[in-house]
UniProtKB/Swiss-Prot annotation:
Organism (species): Neisseria meningitidis serogroup B (strain ATCC BAA-335 / MC58)
Lineage: Bacteria, Pseudomonadati, Pseudomonadota, Betaproteobacteria, Neisseriales
Disulfides per UniProt: none
Residue ranges of the TM segments: none
Name of the protein in question: Diaminopimelate epimerase
Gene from which this protein is expressed: dapF
Example of a GO cellular component annotation carried by this entry: cytosol
């Protein structure tokens, strides 16, 4: 029987079970992640975050993310902020800005004295092969809008990879958007070979949007950091939002602040909070 210490955290209600694999032995491939994610019979969370040491010179930590269904993903923005807060609170680093290795590249979270965390999320990708996405409507590479073929018709989406794949849909009223219905159709769609996160974006002004996200392997969540980044990038490319300005992204769980200038890195700022400490036994 194995005993494991963990911390429950959240970023705007997007909640995580965070495991320190620096100070204790833990192999996620051997863990019953889906059972732990169960909100009635387990710890309950959207994603499991594993904090490890990196073997790459100049990199402080390795960051692994597992969805509630046990599948591993390459990036999670809200998780990145919680990761940074966790390693600081646990005394694993005394740096204000850390270098973190993920499955899809390196990120640079920075902690502020006011409790907010800013993360350089890197450059967005748009080519269908980078999403990945399979166009079926004759669109060229790097198009701002692609068509997803549903039984009800063709759904226009903007495709952005922010370390994980996103399809962004512009809606008039996010409160009335068919997030679960349409999200559950697009998330596993054949045109997205690795499945996709589906964002529903309402543009409020040139520097403000409202957003709901149906996450891959999870369903709708209270907040999605990479989803907020993808939505702002898509809005700028579509001419709906101002480039180089800080855009306020209001999600069900709270507000994130995203900034992007074309060709540059995406910057995300938001809170990260610990909820409780726990310990469990598993075989």
């Amino acid at each position: 029987m194995n005993t494991l210490k963990f911390t429950k955290m959240h970023g705007l209600g997007n909640d995580f079970m965070v495991i320190d694999a620096v100070s204790q032995d833990f192999t996620p491939e051997d863990a019953p992640i889906a059972e732990w994610a169960d909100r009635f019979r387990g710890v309950g969370f959207d994603q499991l975050l594993v904090v490890g040491r990196s073997e790459t010179e100049g990199v402080d930590f390795r960051y692994r993310i597992f969805n509630a269904d046990g599948s591993e993903v390459g990036q999670c923005g809200n998780g990145a902020r919680c990761f940074a807060r966790f390693v600081a609170d646990k005394g694993l680093t005394d740096k204000k800005e850390i270098c973190v290795e993920t499955a899809n590249g390196v990120i640079f979270p920075k902690l502020s004295d006011n409790g907010m965390v800013t993360v350089n999320m890197g450059k967005p990708k748009f080519m269908p092969s980078e999403i990945p996405f399979v166009p079926e409507s004759g669109e060229g590479d790097d198009a701002c809008i692609y068509g997803v073929h549903l039984e009800s018709g063709i759904q226009p989406v903007s495709c952005v990879n922010m370390g994980n794949p996103h399809a962004v849909i512009v809606v008039d009223d996010v409160e009335c958007a068919p997030v679960r219905e349409t999200g559950s159709l697009i998330e596993p769609h054949r045109q997205f070979p690795e499945r996709v996160n589906v964002g529903f974006m309402q543009v409020v002004g040139r520097t403000a949007i409202r957003l709901r996200v149906f996450e891959r392997g999870v369903g709708e969540t209270q907040a999605c950091g990479t989803g907020a980044c993808a939505a702002v990038v898509a809005g700028i490319r579509l001419g709906l939002l101002d480039e180089g300005k800080t855009v306020e992204v209001v999600l069900p769980g709270g507000t994130l602040y995203i900034e992007w200038a074309c060709g540059g890195d995406v910057m995300m700022t938001g809170p990260a909070e610990a909820v409780f400490e726990g310990e469990l036994a598993y075989s």
